[in-house]
Amino acid sequence: MEFQKGPSDQRTFVSAILNMLSLGLSTASLLSSEWFVGAQKVPKPLCGQSLAAKCFDMPMSLDGGITNASAQEVVQYTWEAGDDRFSFLTFRSGMWLSCEETVEEPGEKCRRFIELTPPAQREVLWLSLGAQTAYIGLQFISFLLLLTDLLLTSNPGCGLKLSAFAAVSLVLSGLLGMVAHMLYLQVFQATANLGPEDWRPHSWNYGWAFYTAWVSFTCCMVSAVTTFNTYTRMVLEFKCRHGTSFNTNPSCRAQHHRCFLPPLTCAVHAGEPSTSCHQHPSHPIRSVSESIDLYSAAALQDKKFQQENSQELKEATESSVEEQC
């Protein structure tokens, strides 16, 4: 009766792929300046400057008289009114930088987003950045744990522990990521309302980095659920195949107990197939940690049973010798 780890390996592989995808998307969104995009309402330059508004010339005399006087100057007027007097320039903003188009010359002008944030919101922004960094760090740790579990395919004991730690790390990282995204959204809304007047957006919307961050969060939580499912299945299968054997048949010898649990092969009862599994209702349900260390307890129980059998065999031998004498 061997401990089969094939289906668990497949689920672990799926968890690792989802975790790697989430890690890449979250890193890209953190470094991007496309969380929010929109337009800024900027007055057009005066007549005579570069990229000026549409103007026309009207001659006027210097003394305010008739226009055919000898001394004249040219006054520029524009017919543009309302929103036509303004330019709507695109901008984009991220956790680190905010870039907007310039009127005077083609190109963008970038500023640090923390310089635009109101002083009351800067601590919240730093908290959001810290949570986002911890989110990525925990995802990286989870990926290393899942990768180690995949490489140790013949050691289900450590695989259980690695799956448990990876699942907990993924859940924590997902919660931190959700908090980081919501905090940054709050900071941006406050900056859009209370930030510098030359930066306040006329209209804004979510950019691709915002959606990428939430897709990353979704992949992280799906990976966590898959890892927990893998761990639960391995624990239940392990208890079903091995727990009853150790309690009902002490002749099942456990090999040397280490972190890596060896496969167990033994007969359960005479006349029953080796693959049979019985669930005794009198056996209490063990916790997760007890299930992981089941081999250790079984090995101690088996050792104690061997000592008792050896003592009984010795006494029986002595009594038979005395009877013969």
Curated annotation (Swiss-Prot):
- In its keyword annotation, does this UniProt entry include Transferase? no
One molecular function GO term is: RNA polymerase binding
Pfam families documented for this protein: GSG-1 (PF07803)
Question: What top-level branch of life does the organism fall under?
Answer: Eukaryota
**GO CC annotations, alphabetized:** endoplasmic reticulum; endoplasmic reticulum membrane; plasma membrane
Q: Does the keyword Iron apply?
A: no
What Gene3D superfamilies would the database entry show? 1.20.140.150
Keyword annotations of the record: Endoplasmic reticulum, Membrane, Transmembrane, Transmembrane helix
What function does the entry list?
A: May cause the redistribution of PAPOLB from the cytosol to the endoplasmic reticulum.
- Source organism of this protein record: Rattus norvegicus
UniProt-listed InterPro entries: GSG-1 (IPR012478), PMP-22/EMP/MP20-like (IPR050579)
**Subunit composition and interactions:** Interacts with PAPOLB.
Instruction: List where in the cell it is found.
Output: Endoplasmic reticulum membrane
Q: List membrane-spanning regions.
A: 12-32, 127-147, 165-185, 208-228
Locate the region Disordered. 306-325
What is the membrane topology noted in the UniProt record heading this document?
Multi-pass membrane protein
Q: Where is the composition biased (Basic and acidic residues)?
A: 306-317
* Name of this chain's protein: Germ cell-specific gene 1 protein
